[in-house]
UniProtKB/Swiss-Prot annotation:
It is found in: Mitochondrion inner membrane. Core subunit of respiratory chain NADH dehydrogenase (Complex I) which is composed of 45 different subunits. InterPro entries: NADH_UbQ/plastoQ_OxRdtase_su3, NDAH_ubi_oxred_su3_sf. GO terms for cellular component: mitochondrial inner membrane; respiratory chain complex I. GO terms for biological process: mitochondrial electron transport, NADH to ubiquinone. Core subunit of the mitochondrial membrane respiratory chain NADH dehydrogenase (Complex I) which catalyzes electron transfer from NADH through the respiratory chain, using ubiquinone as an electron acceptor. Essential for the catalytic activity of complex I. Its EC number is 7.1.1.2. This is NADH-ubiquinone oxidoreductase chain 3. It catalyses: a ubiquinone + NADH + 5 H(+)(in) = a ubiquinol + NAD(+) + 4 H(+)(out). Keywords: Electron transport, Membrane, Mitochondrion, Mitochondrion inner membrane, NAD, Respiratory chain, Translocase, Transmembrane, Transmembrane helix, Transport, Ubiquinone. Its main location: mitochondrion. It is a multi-pass membrane protein. The gene is MT-ND3. It is an enzyme of class 7 (translocase).
């Protein structure tokens, strides 16, 4: 227990010291190059602060949700071989149903329509 306390204290002190040194020694001198927008090495064609369509944001969020669904359902074939496969199938069905209902809701609200 004494060794554990020593190791935890040492790691905390080392982390605090490195964080403090980084805060004090950091060179925060913004200039025009650091504050200018960067577009693949070229000067920007227009203002980089223009708002973009919220539909792109919604499509990106939907993509992330369905990508997460795939990541959650990927181990499903191995999980079915466990002692209680019905519990696994119940959770998988629940995940798919929730995402399907969310997609239907988004579709009926017009979130996926591009033309107005």
């Amino acid at each position: 227990m004494n060794t554990l306390t020593f190791m935890l204290s040492l790691s905390f002190l080392l982390s605090a010291a490195l964080t403090t040194m980084n805060f004090w020694l950091a060179q925060m001198a913004p200039d025009t190059e650091k504050l200018s927008p960067y577009e693949c090495g070229f000067d920007p064609l227009g203002s980089a602060r223009l708002p973009f369509s919220i539909r792109f944001f919604l499509v990106a969020i939907l993509f992330l949700l369905f990508d997460l669904e795939i990541a959650l359902l990927l181990p499903l074939p191995w999980a079915i071989q466990l002692a209680h496969p019905m519990m696994t199938l119940t959770w998988a069905t629940t995940i798919i149903a929730l995402l399907t209902f969310g997609l239907i809701y988004e579709w009926t609200q017009g979130g996926l329509e591009w033309a107005e």
